Amino acid sequence: MAAPKLESFRRGSMFDGSFRRGSMFDGSFRQSMRDRLILQSRGYSNVNDDDKTSVRCCSYSYFSDKITGVVKKLKDVLVTAWEMGTADPRKMIFSAKMGLALTLTSILIFFKIPGLELSGHYLWAILTVVVIFEFSIGATFSKGCNRGLGTLSAGGLALGMSWISEMTGNWADVFNAASIFVVAFFATYAKLYPTMKPYEYGFRVFLLTYCYVIVSGYKTGEFMETAVSRFLLIALGASVGLIVNTCIYPIWAGEDLHNLVAKNFVNVATSLEGCVNGYLECVAYDTIPSRILVYEAVAEDPVYSGYRSAVQSTSQEDTLMSFASWEPPHGPYKSFRYPWALYVKVGGALRHCAIMVMALHGCILSEIQAAEDRRREFRNELQRVGIEGAKVLRYIGESLKKMEKLNPIEDILYEIHQAAEELQSKIDKKSYLLVNAKNWEIGNRPRVRDLTDEQKISNLDSDLSRILAHKSQSEATLRPPKNWDDVTTAANLSSATMLPYLQSRTMIHKQPSWPSRISITPGSMLQPPLGEPGKMYESASNLSLATFASLLIEFVARLENLVNAYDELSVKANFKEAVSE
């Protein structure tokens, strides 16, 4: 259907051009009507579309559609706002607290303080409430202290500079301009120092206050009144904001950090179980979501979103830790100088394990996959490691949530270490399944001929152990001599006498060669030998299984560091003793 439409469009364009030529050069009304009828017969009746569009723009249906669209969008916004508020009621409470703080500040400004006129600078109190009123108590204290210190230091420096500028006489303008440049240069350079990053807002307030006092005081000649009134109004706004935010349903950054780290334990455990179960069940993506390839959030994939939340929480943990350090003792965090930094350390150790889970998920997303029968050989061992690993993560996460120490009697890593050792032992025993065993052969071996397919299959299991023993023994005897000259001389002297013995020894220890891999299908018993590309793909697919098992063992090894980090946190934070069940 596409080709006729394209052809008709081209013919229509041709007649459209003839219509224009006829209108411009021929001037014949009959010719123009004839071209118009031809266009309409071919389905092109859009000669007066502009007129119809202009009429439709002024029609009732047009305005009705526009109003309906606006109402629909407004409804969607209201539904989204309601869902956000019900998902986290703290956001609605915080908004109400902000409105209350601004209202109280405005009311207090309306009362005139005897002997001091503040009406000309009342805006600074309102700006202070808007700026320092943050979601958490720690962030509010941080910005409030930064703003107060910046204002106080800048006001004192501005008063000193104004006193010096008065003594310069006619050079006061030049001195004030030069002082602004020098102060701005050093303050901006100082805030770029890495350790000064938490005080960046204080430096900004410092510059703003200094310039404001210098410029406004120069115009009015009242440097002292400008500095004092600004400081008092900022202190008023900061006090109202801190009191309202702290006394009415306080939101603590330390508690958010505690819950975030505990939640990440559960998310990583869910991802670990999903990766192991998905790999053993041969789960494959028909098409890998593009957002996974660029590491964006995908809520529909719990395996991906679980470990991603732990890996991506680095900046959030650092921010919450810096705010929590400003908060006074509260709730279960009653000690001064609470070890919030150790929460970040535990989160980093958990993130170190989550990276292994990400690599396990990458094995599922890989183009080359191991055969199902190969995975079935290691199913029990892989599944046990996944279950025990998820159990350890959930146990630590639950202990962190309850603020309990780990049980000193029970070793929580014992079971998973046993599972990892069983997996390693199974890999050692079945290592011929993970590589191309045919390349292991040393020397030529007689091939078993004149055997039927049924005989090869029946003898396969009995040959496995003998072949593996031969390979391991031959590898164990490969030790390079220290002096090759002695070996060559001895070989030349005894070659004639030892030849019968060597021949008999060779015949005794020769084993049947490792049979080529078989694939049993309903239609045939033995598949023909694979070509070179097929063998390469087969080896790569087997190595993918070895990669998955190795990553799982590495995950187990990294759990030790996680347990040590949690033990350190539980001791310094004075967690309660574990309840023995």
Curated annotation (Swiss-Prot):
Highest taxon above the source species: Eukaryota
Pfam families tied to this protein: ALMT
Biological process annotations from GO: cellular response to phosphate starvation; malate transmembrane transport; monoatomic ion transmembrane transport
Keywords attached to this entry: Ion channel, Ion transport, Membrane, Transmembrane, Transmembrane helix, Transport
Subcellular location: Membrane
GO cellular component, one term: membrane
Membrane topology: Multi-pass membrane protein
InterPro entries attached to this UniProt entry: ALMT
Signal peptide extent: none
Stretches that traverse the bilayer: 98-118, 122-142, 148-164, 167-187, 201-218, 231-251
Family membership noted in the UniProt record: Belongs to the aromatic acid exporter (TC 2.A.85) family.
Role, per record: Malate transporter.
Name recorded for this polypeptide: Putative aluminum-activated malate transporter 3
Organism: Arabidopsis thaliana (Mouse-ear cress)
Taxonomic lineage of the native organism: Eukaryota, Viridiplantae, Streptophyta, Embryophyta, Tracheophyta
